[in-house]
Amino acid sequence: MSLVKKFITVGGATLGSRIFGFARETLMAAALGTGPMADVFYAAFRFPNLFRRLFAEGAFNAAFVPLFAKEIEANGIDGAKRFSEEVFGVLFSVLLLITIVMELAMPLLVRWVIAPGFADDAEKFDLTVRLAAVMFPYLMSMSLTAMMSGMLNSLHHFFAAAVAPIFLNLVMISALFYAIYFGADPLTTAWYLSWSVLVAGVLQLAVVYIGVRHAGISIGLRFPRFTPNVKRLLLLAIPAAITGGVTQINLVIGQAIASGKEGAIAALQYADRIYQLPLGVVGVAVGIVLLPELARSLKSGHIKEAANIQNRSIEFVLFLTLPAAVALWLLSDDIIRVLYERGAFNANNTTLVGSILAIFGLGLPAFVLIKALQPGFYAREDTKSPMRYTAIAVAVNSALSILLFPVLAERGIALAEAVAGWLNAVQLFVTLYRRGHLVWEWSLARRTAMLLVSSAVMGGVIVYLSHRWEPLLGSGSTLLTKTGVLGLLILIAMAVYFIVAFLIGGVDVGMIRRNLKRKRPAPASDAKAVNGE
């Protein structure tokens, strides 16, 4: 499968999952608004979701896929099957133990970690504990799903692993439709949603398990043993978990601080869902394009080529995220109004969530740049530097959130996350440059300036059209009118940005092609290419 086809498969599925996520959040906004029940559910769901991001997705895929692919090359499918069974036995046992411990300690976790601000409200606190207890086993399903997804990617079976995440949103949407159709109250709706999370985890695991069986591997449960391969997996996964989970760590810190104000957690969640769309889709593109190219160049000793690929990846990220950041800043209220403003979600909620989204947009280029810069360390087997910079960013985020929340409330938490993201990105960039892994290019600096100019011109067009079409975008218009006008405005803005960028030299067709295409590698190296996918 060519790189472009892999991008379409994985990136398209990611986009589909984000779209279904929007639908889910829209229904949740209508059913729960930003009231206390929304706060309770999101607080309870954030904890298993954090563990999923830290251990199931980024860390496990970064550690397991290279070792599994290496085992395929060295010992064939039989060796890979043996390795996967070793990992499965240990992973299943560890996850079962973690789940039992967390279930027993859930009241303490809610009081001190998940939502300290709920401690003074006995009813709110008790419900958060019970909902979190229902949803936490989702971690177990998702971790095993991540392992089998890594196997599928190494075997070049991308579809099942790519579509599995969609089932979470589909099942939760079904639960919301059921609740709304039968007129369930917010409490009952929260229970429906909690059980739907657990059901979705089982379905996702079933999808990838069937995919692995179809790919020719049947996994058996072995007695857990910490073999050398398993130990190596753990050594790789721990720093990757800490580094890759910086966004989720920042969100949990923000949630803990925001729990002191009713509605703050839900408002941050609604804004984060939209912000994650460009972050997730572009991040997938960077993962597919950059990592295999960079690893292959370094392995073959082409140091200058590796530096060039790193620079082109930065250019590619800025090309996509700078205009997205401007659009999120200027259109935040209109986007929130179209997606969420109905039912229990009113105009005041739109203003609040829109302001949070605008600030999140400022951090968008930084968080995608992090995804483009970290492979420069991982490809050179340096996992400690990104982990150290992540720790610094988390500390700064915590301090700023505490300082800004009394002044700016939810907006202060969003601003702290954006600042921490930029600090992390700058540290990664400067370190790569000082080590000689990034080569300064005046052409890159000039193109970055031209992309900023193009984004500014696009922003001017957005401001002008938003003012002219304000009556059509306002709360008094029908949903169909608002959606159509907003869609047209975004299309015009995109056209203006691309035209200006091409005309003034901000980007060229060749750059896009270099980032989206590569020659098909020889079979011997094909499995290694999966490491970065």
Curated annotation (Swiss-Prot):
Protein name as it appears in the record: Probable lipid II flippase MurJ
InterPro entries, per the entry: Lipid_II_flippase_MurJ/MviN, MurJ
Primary residence: membrane
Function: Involved in peptidoglycan biosynthesis. Transports lipid-linked peptidoglycan precursors from the inner to the outer leaflet of the cytoplasmic membrane.
Residue spans crossing the bilayer: 25-45, 90-110, 131-151, 158-178, 192-212, 233-253, 274-294, 316-336, 350-370, 389-409, 412-432, 449-469, 484-504
Any GO CC annotation of this UniProt entry: plasma membrane
Naturally occurring in which organism (per UniProt): Rhizobium tropici
Localisation: Cell inner membrane
Any single biological process term in GO: peptidoglycan biosynthetic process
Similarity comment text for this entry: Belongs to the MurJ/MviN family.
Pathway: Cell wall biogenesis; peptidoglycan biosynthesis
Record-level Gene Ontology MF annotations: lipid-linked peptidoglycan transporter activity
Keywords: Cell inner membrane, Cell membrane, Cell shape, Cell wall biogenesis/degradation, Membrane, Peptidoglycan synthesis, Transmembrane, Transmembrane helix, Transport
Annotated Pfam families: MurJ
Annotated membrane topology: Multi-pass membrane protein
